[in-house]
Amino acid sequence: MIDIGAAALNEALIAQSIRPLFSRALASGRPIYLANHSLGRPPDRVVEDVQRALDAWYRDMGEAWDEWLAARDRFRALTAQLVGAPSGDSVIPKTSAGQGLRAVLNLFDAPIRVLSTDSEFDSIDFILRVYRDKGRIELTTVPARAEALIDAMHAGPPQLVVVSTVLFRSGEIVAGIEDVVRSARAAGASVLLDVYHHAGVLPLDLAALDADFAVGGSYKYTRGGPGACWLYVHPRNHSRRTLDTGWFAKDDPFGYERPDPPRFAPGGDAWMESTPPVLAPVQALAGLEFTNAIGAVRLREYHLAQKERFAAQLAQRGLRVEGAGPQFGAFLSLAHPEATRLSAELMRRGVKTDARGDRLRLCADLLNTDDELAAASQAVAGVLDKA
């Protein structure tokens, strides 16, 4: 899809080789888009890919499954490459990260102790609280710090630890996540990492981290839209059985045999469920190929420099933001009690941002120009002056 060699990214190279791949998303008249940490901007090729999958349906009807399943397997392989999974069969397509979490929670036959943090994304937090209220888990939450998690493990060993590697409100990277995983494994606990704000903007090697599970998706930084999510299952857990299953987890889904006990597919395919959505993996392919072609290391180098320039422009206007340093992920954030209202006012001024709680979140990416960031800085300053 893209071949720009190994050169460091710069605005001239991006204008020549990358922006033309996004002509639809960059059409004139659009707001300055600084919500790249939320819904990523898709490559033009997404339209062609989805149309091809639909054409197969119209043309081939039931035989379209061959093409759809090939696209699904391509999605799994590309995601494995992105996150450092040992093979594509360790990546289980899901429609949401929450669906992946439920599959892991439903591994356990009896109520279990779950350790998490007070900084998880709303869906993860909500699911854990519902499982707690249903008597399915005992839930302990601590601050999102490695020391707090490890201390809590020593106080009462959990069966499952659920923690983000990058926090969704502030973009802060949770330092010492390797120590958390090691301590959990030593205590006999499984670990599920939420890497949604990590994959695609920071180098990631799940195999090296040795986490049991991880959840993420293509909605944000890999530009694949909603529904193209996944659960990573470490190979040592391929033989474990969750209640979240279905006929695609059988050893021969289209054989229609019913052995008793059920026979599961080999490897990670045993974690599949029932009939999957077919367009979500298709719509994610172009963005995954694009991200892998550039590489997380090169993207991170560019984004760090870009964040620092953006933060400096805001600082020149008297605005203090968090997130510019290497201890943060992809976006800047500005603490303000009326962050949601500020985001709405910025949209009226032609700058698309978002807010989570008291945080106004601002995320440039390689499609944003320095001129756009200068204009956005002026708009943010104007909105705050008015406030």
Task: Tell what function each PLM region has.
Residues 1-387:
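Pyridoxal 5′-phosphate
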